[in-house]
Design a protein with these regions (language model features):
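A Rossmann-like FAD-binding core segment of flavoenzymes
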Residues: 101-110, 118, 125, 203-294
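Glycine-rich, N-terminal phosphate-binding loop of Rossmann-like dinucleotide-binding domains
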Residues: 13, 122, 134-135, 183, ...
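FAD-site-proximal beta/loop scaffold in flavoenzymes
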Residues: 148-175, 266-270, 274-331, 343
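C-terminal auxiliary extensions adjacent to catalytic cores
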Residues: 372-414
Length: 414
């Protein structure tokens, strides 16, 4: 795959729905005031809130999001290496308000599917359709000692304060110190994310602390995304020791030691332990998760839950296979779901639209790799039809990623 052109991006990312614009959506006449409540203002939820309003301005949309700022997880690994500033990844929700989205910076406390309402503090919000896009929570109990140490053992897997804290720990590392990071077992948010992080930390150490090294303990048998590309990148970093099939089972902050499932004890000076993950608690408590008790099962045409009617689930909380838990996929799901919801509210058959995915991974201060995935819908399930990878790391690919992020951030929040 050569440079990602705008046309390729629109085709593969699901942005074609966005590019249609409100004026070209089907005319959906309002019979009465309907309300859609959206839980979570991330890549999926914020997109869905905006596009419900674009699809049918007669629908009242309320977005529940505790944070007053949108902080992008994509590109946050660059902050760890001093290549990017977190301020550049931080935006507000003003654009959504311009589209008529009502925003309450509060957390949803509980979902009551039988009464079609969401508890927010001491109040209730009733809905005709609910869109749940709450992201992920961590399974602290899967690593012995982690629950007690979770405030000091950083994951930095939700961009924000921990991103800055981990960056400071790396800056304070003595030259010759050891950094250990762990990769959780699949499925988890952003499959290539840990390997991008490993690349950026290795680059930082090679540049700033050449006597130091990075040990990556991967719970999976092999690199799970962009495998060949990351293997080639890892070979370029002599200070990076990659250990597959080594799951972190215990953390001892007193002795600064991680124990793996094969009995290895690994000493560290800085630890970045990314825990196993599941759908956020609000989705688990509402019994939206499937048999695995981790991820939510949905219909891939409407993203309606298979467990509860009139509730739709987006983004990282969904099982999603074969699509990855990526920001681009969540954005794509948000647009597809929004259009489906407005059709359903008006007793119309929802259109069938597959999601798309474009994912960039930086591997040094100036180079990146990328993948594009294309899908179709078969029997109301997503099926992958094509995957294209860049041939190797490239400065051009890295530069293209800036255009991609500007476009998609505007699509979500603009």
């Amino acid at each position: 795959m050569k440079n990602l052109t705008r046309r390729q991006f629109i085709k593969t990312s699901g942005l074609s729905i966005a590019m249609m614009g409100a004026s070209t959506f089907p005319s959906l006449a309002a019979e009465s005031k309907r309300r859609v409540v959206v839980i979570g203002g991330g890549w999926g939820g914020a997109t869905a809130a905006k596009y419900v309003r674009l699809s049918d301005p007669s629908v009242e949309v309320t977005l529940l999001e505790p944070s007053k700022e949108f902080i992008s997880c994509p590109f946050s690994n660059l902050v760890l290496a001093g290549v990017e500033n977190l301020k550049n990844l931080t935006m507000n929700y003003t654009g959504l308000r311009k589209h008529g989205v009502q925003i309450r910076h509060e957390a949803a406390a509980a979902i009551e599917p039988d009464k079609q309402r969401v508890r927010v503090g001491m109040d209730y919000l009733e809905y005709d359709r609910l869109i749940v896009s709450p992201g992920i929570d961590f399974q602290w109990d899967q690593v012995e000692g982690l629950a007690e140490a979770k405030d000091t053992v950083l994951h930095a897997w939700k961009a924000g304060p921990q991103t800055l804290q981990l960056a400071k720990q790396l800056q304070s590392l003595p030259d010759g110190g050891v950094v250990v990071m762990t990769v959780p077992p699949v499925a988890y948010r952003c499959p290539p994310g840990p390997y991008e992080r490993a690349s950026m930390i290795a680059w930082y150490l090679q540049t700033k602390k050449p006597k130091s090294k990075l040990i990556v303990l991967d719970a999976n048998k092999d690199i799970v995304s962009k495998t060949g590309l990351f293997k080639a990148v890892f070979k370029d970093y002599q200070n990076l020791e990659y250990r597959p099939a080594q799951k972190a089972e215990k953390i001892d902050v007193g002795s600064k030691e991680v124990t793996t499932d094969i009995g290895d004890k690994v000493k560290y000076d800085v630890i970045n332990l990314i825990p196993p993950q599941r759908a956020a608690a609000i989705a688990v408590d509402a019994e939206l998760v499937g048999a695995d008790k981790r991820w939510c099962e949905v219909d891939h045409v409407t993203y309606e839950s298979v467990k509860h009617k009139n509730i739709h689930v987006l983004g990282d909380s969904t099982i999603g296979l074969p699509v990855p838990k990526s920001g681009n996929v969540a954005n794509s799901m948000g647009k597809i779901c929004a259009l489906a919801v407005t059709h359903l509210l008006n007793s119309k058959e929802p259109p069938v639209n597959p999601p798309g995915n474009v994912c960039y991974s930086w591997v040094s201060d100036k180079e990146a790799i990328a993948v594009v995935n294309s899908y179709r819908i078969e029997n109301r399930k997503v099926v992958q039809i094509e995957q294209k990878l860049t041939p190797g790391k490239s400065v051009t690919v890295a530069q293209n990623s800036f255009g991609w992020r500007a476009n998609i951030w505007n699509d979500i929040l603009g």
